[in-house]
């Protein structure tokens, strides 16, 4: 698939630690829509610097209305029909990018990528953390996200053709025990 025909949708809030690496992995896509939720760190500066170099990023802003609703709002800003939804703490591996380029998608295709969840930079291969498949590529005229406030996911219609990629996203999930406890308490 031509990556220029895919809009990448990213939600961000205070993502300065991972955003540059995330965006760099997405530079070949036709459009990146970044939906900011009141970042107070250098997130927007990083995004603007990226856009100066690649000219394919658009910044929108919204209050927090729940993750499902925010992701659907972000998708609504996308100019392309095909969507790659990625989190600001995820990085698309080169092998996964090559696999996406080789796809021949029909409108009813929904694509899952495995995530390599990382703890303090190390890949967690046990405890059900890999493969952690997440539905991330879809045609916005076919489906979208559920409206869950947290733990949102792409709705999979019965007539969807499901495709699982062999390659993955690196997910910088947590970097300390403190961040694990913070996430557990938040969600």
Where are the predicted features?
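Short, well-formed alpha-helical segments that are part of the catalytic scaffolds
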Residues: 10-28
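Internal alpha-helical transmembrane segments
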Residues: 85-86, 90-91
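Short beta-strand/loop segment that forms part of the nucleotide-sugar
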Residues: 30-38, 60-62, 88
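Catalytic-site signature of metal-activated, phosphate-bearing donor transferases
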Residues: 68-75, 82, 93-187
């Amino acid at each position: 698939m031509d990556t220029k025909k895919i809009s990448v949708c990213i939600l961000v809030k205070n993502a300065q630690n991972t955003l540059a690496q995330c965006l760099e992995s997405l530079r070949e896509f036709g459009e990146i829509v970044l939906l900011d939720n009141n970042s107070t760190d250098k997130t927007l500066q990083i995004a603007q610097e990226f856009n100066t170099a690649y000219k394919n990023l658009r910044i929108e802003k919204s209050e927090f209305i729940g993750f499902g609703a925010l992701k659907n709002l972000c998708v609504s800003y996308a100019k392309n029909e095909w969507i790659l939804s990625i989190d600001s703490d995820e990085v698309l591996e080169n092998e996964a990018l090559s696999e996406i380029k080789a796809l021949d998608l029909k409108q009813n295709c929904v694509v899952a990528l495995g995530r390599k969840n990382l703890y303090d930079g190390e890949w967690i291969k046990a405890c059900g953390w890999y493969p952690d498949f997440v539905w991330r590529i879809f045609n916005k005229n076919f489906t979208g996200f559920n409206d869950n406030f947290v733990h949102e996911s792409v709705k999979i219609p019965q007539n969807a053709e499901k495709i699982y990629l062999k390659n993955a996203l690196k997910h910088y999930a947590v970097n300390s025990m403190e961040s694990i406890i913070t996430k557990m308490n938040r969600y």
